[in-house]
UniProtKB/Swiss-Prot annotation:
Disulfide bonds: none
Encoding gene, per UniProt annotation: ackA
Catalysed reactions listed for this entry: acetate + ATP = acetyl phosphate + ADP
GO cellular-component term (any): cytoplasm
Details of cofactor binding: Mg(2+). Can also accept Mn(2+).
Pfam (any one): Acetate_kinase
Protein name as catalogued: Acetate kinase
Site, as annotated: Transition state stabilizer: 179, 240
Binding site for substrate: 90
Length: 403
């Protein structure tokens, strides 16, 4: 079975074509700057990279170019579009309705649209990708895989906010959590590496990228996560503030005379590492490099960043009444021995012992255990693979309906 995985953003479509037998990526790429001047397709087959400059006014045109490239004589990897058996889509928000991945039909499309106010930047773009695929590949099943679904096992005590309950009833304001597909993939993979059953383990997964979140995965089910009603809550991120006294935005708005939308943009786009570093960078690589060269302010930014992660790990160890493994993933989690070492230095009370050499070596796509053999809690690095998880779900659902 061949599955086309699509991640449709507001001005881009990322894609991978995966041969499910052997789980091999045949090609991948991105159509970027959709609806903006300078749009193009970057298409990769193995180590080869091809760039096609083309005007892409909308998502349908972008997907059309992607599909044409897949069957192109020179650049293609298949002879006919009929070789695509199914399409798997990343959908950011499934609200309370979707607890697992689903086959897309008219009812599902309507439901995704209904929860769009909860993810106004993402869901409408995800929908455009689904609708384009349904139009351009008629008869091919489409599956929606939700970022929020894995977190739907979180109990009420962890997802309800201490605000008037009527706001939950009226507007469904609660903790939803994000990065669910990544947390699900790395917790499952960590159990495989440890040679244990996922259902027997208490795992804390740390998805640390430009956006970042921690999840408590108890016996295979998520019981808490750091992102909340939106992806703004929790850890210090590239440009997002993470946890904040709710009175602070009101105070700033009053003092600066700014609107709620402007305040929202500040918290989402100008805060986090970028805000703390006084606009120096939102990229942790730049912060680490400056800190290593002796920049005292960047050292402090690093400390704030790592301290918040460690605090959440400690909290989730308490939430699960113990922890067997801690997993680092995503851009920073997979490639920053500095952050991993600093975070783990706070966790010695849990019995965490890091193997310095393994920590230094496990970067750039490598996976493995980076704690010492006598560490009470195992620490792992697992490169995330959300596309593969989407493809697996798609295959499973399509096989069930016997397509």
């Amino acid at each position: 079975m061949r599955v086309l995985v699509i991640n449709s953003g507001s001005s881009s479509i990322k894609y991978q074509l995966i041969e499910m037998e052997g789980e091999k990526v045949l090609c991948k790429g991105i159509a970027e700057r959709i609806g903006i001047e300078g749009s193009r397709l970057v298409h990769r087959v193995g180590d080869e990279k091809h760039v096609i400059e083309r005007e892409l006014p909308d998502h349908e045109e972008a997907l059309k170019l992607i599909l044409n490239t897949l069957v192109d004589e020179k650049l293609g990897v298949i002879k006919d579009l009929k070789e695509i058996d199914a399409v798997g889509h990343r959908v950011v928000h499934g609200g309370e309705r979707f607890k697992e991945s689903v086959l897309v039909d008219e009812e599902v499309l309507k439901a995704i649209e209904e929860v769009s106010p909860l993810a106004p930047l993402h869901n409408p773009a995800n929908l455009m990708g689904i609708k384009a695929a349904m139009k351009l590949l008629p008869g091919v099943p489409n599956v929606a895989v939700f970022d929020t679904a894995f977190h739907q096992t979180i109990p009420q005590k962890a997802y309800l906010y201490a605000i008037p309950y009527e706001y939950y009833e009226k507007y469904k304001i609660r903790r939803y959590g994000f990065h669910g597909t990544s947390h699900r993939y790395v917790s499952k993979r960590a159990a495989e590496i440890l040679g244990k059953k996922l259902e027997e383990l208490k795992i804390i997964t740390c998805h640390i990228g430009n956006g970042a979140s921690v999840a408590a995965v108890k016996y295979g089910k998520c019981v808490d996560t750091s992102m909340g009603f939106t992806p703004l809550e929790g850890l210090v991120m590239g440009t997002r503030s993470g946890d904040l006294d709710p009175a602070i935005p009101f105070f700033i708005m009053e003092k600066e005379g700014i609107s709620p939308q402007e305040m929202y943009d500040i918290l989402n786009k100008k805060s986090g590492v970028y805000g703390l570093s006084k606009g120096f960078s939102s990229d942790m690589r730049d912060i680490e490099e400056a800190a290593l060269k002796g920049d005292e302010w960047c050292k402090l930014v690093l400390e704030i960043y790592d301290y918040r992660i460690a605090k959440y790990i400690g909290a989730y160890a308490a939430a699960m009444n113990g922890v067997d493994a801690i997993v680092f993933t995503a851009g920073v989690g997979e490639n920053s021995p500095i952050t991993r070492e600093d975070v783990c230095s706070y966790l010695e009370f849990l019995g965490v012992k890091l193997d310095k050499q393994k920590n230094e070596e496990t970067i750039r796509g490598k996976e493995g255990i980076i704690s010492t053999p006598d560490s009470r809690v195992k620490v792992l690095v697992v490169p995330t693979n959300e596309e593969l998880m989407i493809a697996r779900d798609t295959k499973e659902i399509v096989e069930k309906i016997g397509r």
